[in-house]
A protein has these predicted regions:
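N-terminal loops that bind phosphate or other acidic moieties
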Residues: 1-339
Length: 339
């Protein structure tokens, strides 16, 4: 038996009805396949918060200016941001990675490509070479974390304007209209939402990103931190590390990674169904069904780390002593179709 088959065998011998922990069981089996062992262990885990700024902020697509990206990154480094507080519940270490903030922040991991992207409503957000460089930096980040002993990585992001970039990418990759999937991000007004839709439509009309070339989409309307997350998802497959998907920005990065390398999907764990409208379509495209439906849209990886306490509880049962053999009774057998 391979690792996944061994993990399923283990679940079938835990003293409970078959498949009664539902998607949690499926995730544990998936992690066994990623880690290539049925002795699933995710005790050492981290959240990588990818930070970057966006030139499209100049179009009035966000309530805040780019200076807020650096302020939140400072809070992450200091351990006081929302993600730090939520991650502490599950013993998750948090790192901020600078893929391209306008203002560098001491204490972040340096993955910088440039001081923010260009305004995609006027010109391509970045060059293809820059996109490739950021993706590689994300892959390298997974390698570094694996070398430090981390067994699982949650993704997150911080970048004012990045829901605009990620929605533009989703429109291109899914061949749909900004009218259909553009959300309010961090609480835009009606006027702000219209500016956001207009900026996305303008970028798509000017640059014609190629839906069949994910790197082209990423370079023309993406962001450095989004590209970094694409690399993290690709790195998960390469280095046998489970990677948790967060909200809409992370989901777009996951979709982009799958378009680049379809096999990378096997190392991705969906966490929650964000209330951003694009997420439903992306998860459908990926064939994924997130466990948590809490209308979260905070970002920073907060949705991703919310999955960890649930996984920890499932693994307590998976590794626990409460088995049919221990109790001296026969295991349940599938009854579907039996008289």
């Amino acid at each position: 038996m391979n690792a996944q088959e061994q993990a399923q065998f283990r679940w079938n011998h835990v003293a409970k009805p078959l498949n009664s922990l539902g998607k949690l069981e499926q995730l544990v089996v998936q992690i066994a396949g990623i880690q290539q062992t049925a002795d699933v262990c995710i005790n050492k885990r981290c959240a990588l918060i990818c930070c970057g700024d966006h030139g499209v902020v100049a179009e009035g697509v966000s309530q805040s200016g780019s200076e807020v990206t650096a302020l939140v990154a400072q809070s992450i480094v200091a351990g006081t941001a929302n993600i730090n507080l939520m991650a502490s519940v599950s013993g998750t270490d948090v790192y901020a990675l600078d893929f391209g903030m306008v203002t560098p922040v001491a204490g972040t991991i340096d993955c910088r490509i440039a001081a923010g992207t260009r305004n995609m409503a006027r010109e391509p957000a970045m060059t293809r070479a820059q996109a490739e460089q950021a993706v590689q930096a994300g892959i390298d980040a997974v390698a570094r974390m694996k070398a430090r002993g981390y067994q699982l990585i949650a993704t997150g992001e911080m970048g004012i304007g990045n829901t605009t970039a990620s929605t533009a990418m989703a429109c291109a990759l899914l061949r749909c209209s900004p009218e259909d999937i553009t959300g309010r991000g961090a609480g835009l007004s009606d006027a702000g939402l219209q500016r956001k839709k207009a900026a996305i439509q303008r970028a798509l009309s000017i640059h014609h990103p190629d839906a069949d070339d994910a790197l082209d989409v990423l370079a023309k309307v993406g962001g450095f931190e989004i590209a970094g997350m694409v690399g993290i998802f690709l790195g998960g497959l390469r280095h046998h590390v489970p990677i948790i998907i967060d909200g809409v920005i992370s989901a777009v990065a996951a979709l982009t990674a799958v378009r680049i390398d379809p096999a990378s999907k096997s190392a991705m764990l969906p966490a929650h169904m964000s209330h951003e409208p694009a997420v439903v379509r992306i998860m459908s495209e990926l064939g994924m069904s997130p466990i948590i439906h809490a209308d979260m849209a905070l970002g920073e990886g907060t949705g991703a780390v919310s999955l960890l306490p649930l996984l920890d509880m499932a693994l307590k049962v998976y590794h626990g002593p409460h088995t049919f053999d221990e109790l001296g009774i026969s295991a349940y057998e599938p009854q579907e179709g039996k008289a």
